[in-house]
Amino acid sequence: MATITECRAALKRLSDNLAAADGEVRGAAALDRTLSCHLTDLDTTFTGRLADGRIEVEDTVVGPPPWKAQIRLRMTGDDLVAMVDGDLNFAKAWASGRVGLEAGFRDLLKLRSLL
């Protein structure tokens, strides 16, 4: 099982990947939205923002998200690490319910290029 430290490092790598992206991916990552990532197996949530093409983790809390972020992710720590490492396809994991993504309709349309 991935640790909280490994998951935080995975989010940092994802942020770095988004910042280095171009084209549609860069456009989708350029949103300015609140973000939460609930790691179900660790019962831990990272909260922060997707802003300026980067993920900024502002807090780590025990349990589910304390407030409803504009973009909400739900998965296990192992799945987060596997997705960032390229070992798990996000679109397939989302379609199967293995990974949860909730956001407003317009944000989902923009975020689809990240899938």
Show where each model-derived region lies.
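Feature captures hydrophobic
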Residues: 1-115
